[in-house]
């Protein structure tokens, strides 16, 4: 079941409802990534709704956006039993720890890109 089928656009889910929807088996991986983004990168998550119907609606529904210096660092799309991570230019389907490690590396690269662009504007 996809997240838009459970959470309507008009009814924003709570953090607890999103975690419950994803399921215990994937929650540790999500929490690991969320903690990294909040603590190391000092970004606050923001819930948003996407109406994108691409790829059989997997991008549709509530997502969690993380921005750094006004630029998208990544967006997490929670699904039942897994989650998708969209980083500008690439995406990952996270179902295991190996994929989370790939996502962490991609986030570090994205943060470096944002920092480099910020420095060239100064």
Regions found by a protein language model. Name each.
Residues 1-122:
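Charge-dense, helix-prone N-terminal extensions
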């Amino acid at each position: 079941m996809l997240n838009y089928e459970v959470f309507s656009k008009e009814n924003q889910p709570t953090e607890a409802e999103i975690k419950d929807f994803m399921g215990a088996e994937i929650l540790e991986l999500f929490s690991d990534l969320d903690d990294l983004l909040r603590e190391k990168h000092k970004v606050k998550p923001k819930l948003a709704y996407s109406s994108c119907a691409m790829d059989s609606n997997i991008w549709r529904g509530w997502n969690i956006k993380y921005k750094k210096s006004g630029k998208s660092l990544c967006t997490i799309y929670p699904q039942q039993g897994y989650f998708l991570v969209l980083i500008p230019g690439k995406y990952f389907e996270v179902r295991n720890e190996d994929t989370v490690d790939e996502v962490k590396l991609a986030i570090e690269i994205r943060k470096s890109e944002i920092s480099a662009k910020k420095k060239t504007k100064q």
